[in-house]
Regions:
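Extreme N-terminal starter segment of soluble prokaryotic enzymes
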Residues: 1-4
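Short polar catalytic/cofactor-binding loops
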Residues: 8-14
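Cys-nucleophile CN-hydrolase/nitrilase-fold catalytic domain and related Cys-dependent amidase chemistry
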Residues: 16, 25-110, 172-197, 201-204
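Short amphipathic alpha-helices and their capping/turn segments at secondary-structure boundaries
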Residues: 21-35, 153-162
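Active-site catalytic loop in hydrolytic enzyme cores
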Residues: 61-64, 86-194, 259-263
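CN hydrolase (nitrilase-like) catalytic-core segments centered on the catalytic cysteine
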Residues: 61-79, 146-244
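Short beta-strand scaffold segments in enzyme catalytic cores
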Residues: 80-82, 93-97, 131-133, 224-226, ...
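C-terminal beta-strand edge segments of enzyme domains
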Residues: 197-198, 204-341
Length: 341
């Protein structure tokens, strides 16, 4: 069994030292309660609405404040989130796995919302790497930050890369109050739908830790959860209340679910790779749909009025333009063909 503790906290905006002290306090409380994995929310060390404060609270990975916090994780796995500053002085919203006194893994937020009340791209750079990581728990962890999970490729890639436990740390504001929603809050209903769907589709545990409290008039709703690999809620923390919430899970559930429902086994990665390559080139205006005539818009998977012999070979290209010679080989380069204007 693995005991998971969700630290649903209300960090103080810009008060790095105070938030570090609160993290150490809750880590020790979780340790005393027998926790194996402790998860804090997005930017739990700094608060969310930082804007120009981001430069003041940013830490490099060798910052003594971060390494001191890591030193408090003996015999524990802890996920914390902070503003990371790179060697070239870019700032990232980061989530780090601290284990046995070390910084073991760092994920930089991939998708920075800059719409509505969000303005992250003004102050942060986007990450460009996604990796699952082994852990002392005996399971692979896939760590993502808030908006990352609004892009379905992220949980899928983490699970395919070896994650059995998907961890999302979040600072999600409460929006869309309506009695018609399951919990009276549209944001919460949306996140709950996402977490259950991802758990089922990846046959993984999903750990969602959201903050509470208020930053600059923005209210965060909490509602942290642990979802089992068949999509059932194992733990649901209350909305808006601060606290440390724990639950025991058996990682054997992942094995049982993946044997009975082998979705990851049956993913056709070579097909995805090939078709994604085609889509990328089409979006860049450098290739046509594989079934379209030159000058025609992208068509069907198989052109319905084409004779059988045409379906089995690529369309003719204008003189001097190379055609697709991969013959279905996903490792072959995709032809770089520009659309006619």
């Amino acid at each position: 069994m693995v005991r998971i503790a969700l630290a649903q906290i209300a960090p103080r905006l810009g008060a790095l030292d105070d938030n570090l002290a609160r993290h150490r306090e809750l880590i020790e409380e979780a340790r005393a309660g027998g926790a194996d994995l402790v998860v804090f929310p997005e930017l739990g060390l700094t608060g969310y609405q930082l804007q120009d404060l981001a430069a003041e609270v940013a830490m490099r990975l060798d910052d003594p404040r971060l390494t001191t916090l890591a030193a408090a994780t003996d015999a524990l796995s802890v996920v914390v989130s902070f503003v990371e500053e790179s060697d070239d002085h870019r700032r990232f919203i980061a989530a780090a796995l601290l284990e046995d006194g070390e910084v073991r893994h760092v994920h930089r937020k991939l998708f920075l919302p800059t719409y509505g009340l969000f303005d992250e791209r003004r102050f942060f750079a986007a990450g460009d790497v996604l990796r699952a990581t082994p852990s002392r728990l005996g399971a692979g962890l896939g760590i993502a930050v808030c908006e990352d999970f609004w892009h379905l490729g992220v949980p899928q890639l983490l699970a395919l890369d070896g994650a059995q436990v998907l961890v999302n740390v979040s600072s999600s504001p409460g929006r869309d109050l309506a009695a018609t929603h399951e919990v009276g809050l549209g944001t919460a209903s949306s996140w709950r739908n996402l977490m259950r769907a991802y758990a089922q589709l990846t046959t993984s545990f999903v750990v969602f830790c959201n903050r509470v409290g208020v930053d600059e008039s923005v209210t965060f709703w909490g509602g942290s959860e642990v979802i089992g690999p068949s999509g059932q809620a194992i733990l649901s923390a209350p909305l808006f209340d601060e606290g440390l919430f724990t639950v025991d899970v058996s990682l054997d559930e992942v094995r049982r679910e993946r044997i009975s429902l082998p979705l990851l086994r049956d993913e056709r990665l070579e097909w995805q790779l090939r078709e994604l390559g085609r889509v990328v080139l089409e979006r860049a205006g450098m290739s046509l749909d594989s079934t379209a005539e030159w000058g025609a818009p992208p068509g069907f998977d198989v052109a319905p009025d084409a004779p059988d012999d045409r379906r089995s070979r690529p369309p003719a290209a204008p003189d001097g333009v190379p055609t697709d010679t991969s013959n279905g080989d996903p490792s072959a380069p995709i032809p770089m063909r520009r659309r006619r204007s």
